[in-house]
C-alpha cells in the first residue's frame, strides 16, 4: 500500500497544478472583501438597513449590501447622505466606525445631479474638485487609522459680528466652514479678522480651509461696492506652523463674469490651539472635523464606485481620489441598473461586488481579492495578507514561464519533496528486506 501512495501522489500533484494553470485557478476576484473580521464599511442607502419605506416594495430591496450583514455591527450608512455631505452641510449624519480593513461605498449623494453652487453664478465644478480633494485626504488617512468619527470644533471670536450662512442651494446649506459677518464699524472688508479654535481628543483632524476663488463683491451694507480677494489661513499657536492660501482666479458672481465659488483644501492637523486669520473679506473657520484615532499598520482602503444609473448625471471624483498606494478602487463595466426598487438601487453587478464582504480572503491587492495563498497567474500588486505567488502562463508554449521568486521557492519545495520520497522508498525497501530475511 505504501508504494501505491508514492506512485499516486506525483500524478495527483501534477493534475492539481495542471487544473490551476489551465482553468485560471485562484484568479483575482473583482470584489471588496477582508482578511479577517476586523473590517468596517461606510455607506449610503445602498447599505442602509435601517431605511424605512411604505411603497409596497420588498423589504431591503434597495440594498446592494447582502442583508445577512445588516446585524454585523460593521456598517455606518445613511440613506441620502455621504461623508462629504455631512462634513460640509447642515444635512448631517454622524458617521462613526472602526476597523483595520476599511471599505467606502458612498459619495453619490453629492454629485453633478444635485448641481450645488455656493452663489447664484457659482461653479459646481469647483465643488467636484472639493469632493475629490476631500476623499483623497480621507482615503489616505484611513489607510493609517482605525477609527473615523465627526467632532464639533469650538471657537472663540472677540468681535460682535455673528456667523452668517452665505452658501445655500436648494436643500443644502453650508455650515462648515463657518463664516463670520463683517463688523459694523468697518466701512468695507479691507480689515484683518481672527478667531481662535481648539482641536483636542483625536490623533489627527481633517478640517476645511476654504477661500472664494475670485473677486468677491461686498454686501449691500458695503457702500464702497468693491470687489475683494479672499485670503484665509490657520496658524498653529503651539508649533508656529502656518497654513493658508489666497484666491487667484479672475472670476466673479455676475451673469457677465460667472464662476465665483468656494475652493477648499482639506488639512490633516494635529491636536492644538489654532488661530484663524482673514486679511480681506470674510473670516472663516472650521465648525466640524473628522476625528482620526488609533493609528494602525498601513492597510489600503477599498473604494466601490458610487454612481447613479445613467438617467442621472454622476461624477468620478471618488475614483480620482482613490490612488495607490493607499486605496484600491472597485467598479463594474456596466451601467448601474437597479432591480425591484428603482434604477438607482439594487444593481446585480454591484451586489456581486459587495458579496465579498460575506467571507474572508487570503489576499487583497490592486487587481482584486485572492481567495487562496498558493499560486495564481497574476502577481498581486500592492498585496496585503497572505498573497499567492505568480506564474506567467504561456498558452502558446508547452511549458509555463514562472517569475523568478516563485521558481526559487517551488524549486526548494520540490527538492525537499524528492528527498522525502527517496527516503521513504529506501526505508520501505530496507524494511521489506529485513522482513523477508526474518521470514
Swiss-Prot record:
Q: Which UniProt keywords apply?
A: Disulfide bond, Glycoprotein, Hemagglutinin, Host cell membrane, Host membrane, Hydrolase, Membrane, Signal, Transmembrane, Transmembrane helix, Viral envelope protein, Virion
Intravirion side, ranges: 429-439
Give the span(s) annotated as Esterase domain 1: 12-132
Q: Which InterPro entries match?
A: Capsid_hemagglutn, HEMA, Hemagglutn-estrase_core, Hemagglutn-estrase_hemagglutn
Q: Which residues lie on this side of the membrane: Virion surface?
A: 23-407
Which residues are annotated as active site? 45, 342, 345
At the top of the EC hierarchy, this enzyme's class is hydrolase
Q: Where is the signal peptide?
A: 1-22
What this protein is called in its record is Hemagglutinin-esterase
Amino acid at each position: 500500500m505504501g508504494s501505491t501512495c508514492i506512485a499516486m501522489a506525483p500524478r495527483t500533484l501534477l493534475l492539481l497544478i495542471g487544473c490551476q494553470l489551465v482553468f485560471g485557478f485562484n484568479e483575482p476576484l473583482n470584489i471588496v472583501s477582508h482578511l479577517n473580521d476586523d473590517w468596517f464599511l461606510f455607506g449610503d442607502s445602498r447599505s442602509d438597513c435601517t431605511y424605512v419605506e411604505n411603497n409596497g416594495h420588498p423589504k431591503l430591496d434597495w440594498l446592494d449590501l447582502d442583508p445577512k450583514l445588516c446585524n454585523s455591527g460593521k456598517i455606518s450608512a445613511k440613506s441620502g447622505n455621504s461623508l462629504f455631505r455631512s462634513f460640509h452641510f447642515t444635512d448631517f449624519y454622524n458617521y462613526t466606525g472602526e476597523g483595520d480593513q476599511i471599505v467606502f461605498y458612498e459619495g453619490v449623494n453629492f454629485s453633478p445631479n444635485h448641481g450645488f453652487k455656493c452663489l447664484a453664478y457659482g461653479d459646481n465644478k469647483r465643488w467636484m474638485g472639493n469632493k475629490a480633494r476631500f476623499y483623497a485626504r480621507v482615503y489616505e488617512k484611513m489607510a493609517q487609522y482605525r477609527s473615523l468619527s465627526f467632532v464639533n470644533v469650538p471657537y472663540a471670536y472677540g468681535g460682535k459680528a455673528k456667523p452668517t450662512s452665505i452658501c445655500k442651494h436648494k436643500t443644502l446649506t453650508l455650515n462648515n466652514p463657518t463664516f463670520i459677518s463683517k463688523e459694523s464699524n468697518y466701512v468695507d472688508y479691507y480689515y484683518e479678522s481672527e478667531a481662535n479654535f481648539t482641536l483636542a481628543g483625536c490623533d489627527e483632524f481633517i478640517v476645511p480651509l476654504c477661500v472664494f476663488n475670485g473677486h468677491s463683491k461686498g454686501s449691500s451694507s458695503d457702500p464702497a461696492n468693491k470687489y475683494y480677494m479672499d485670503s484665509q489661513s490657520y496658524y498653529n499657536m503651539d508649533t508656529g506652523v502656518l497654513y493658508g492660501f489666497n484666491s487667484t482666479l479672475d472670476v466673479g458672481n455676475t451673469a457677465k463674469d460667472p464662476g465665483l465659488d468656494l475652493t477648499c483644501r482639506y488639512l490633516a492637523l494635529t491636536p492644538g490651539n489654532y488661530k484663524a486669520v482673514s486679511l480681506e473679506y470674510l473670516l472663516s473657520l472650521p465648525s466640524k472635523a473628522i476625528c482620526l484615532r488609533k493609528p494602525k499598520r498601513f492597510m489600503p482602503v477599498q473604494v466601490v464606485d458610487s454612481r447613479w444609473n445613467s438617467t442621472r448625471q454622476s461624477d468620478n471624483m471618488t475614483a480620482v481620489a482613490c490612488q495607490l498606494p493607499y486605496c484600491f478602487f472597485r467598479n463594474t463595466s456596466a451601467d448601474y441598473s437597479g432591480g425591484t426598487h428603482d434604477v438607482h438601487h439594487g444593481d446585480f453587478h454591484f451586489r456581486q461586488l459587495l458579496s465579498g464582504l460575506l467571507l474572508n480572503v487570503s489576499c487583497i491587492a490592486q487587481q482584486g481579492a485572492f481567495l487562496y495563498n498558493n499560486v495564481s497567474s497574476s502577481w498581486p500588486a500592492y498585496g496585503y495578507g497572505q498573497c499567492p505567488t505568480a506564474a506567467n502562463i504561456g498558452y502558446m508554449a508547452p511549458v509555463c514561464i514562472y517569475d523568478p521568486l516563485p521558481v526559487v521557492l517551488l524549486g526548494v519545495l520540490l527538492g525537499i519533496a524528492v528527498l522525502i520520497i527517496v527516503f521513504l522508498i529506501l526505508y520501505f525497501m530496507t524494511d521489506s528486506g529485513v522482513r523477508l530475511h526474518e521470514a
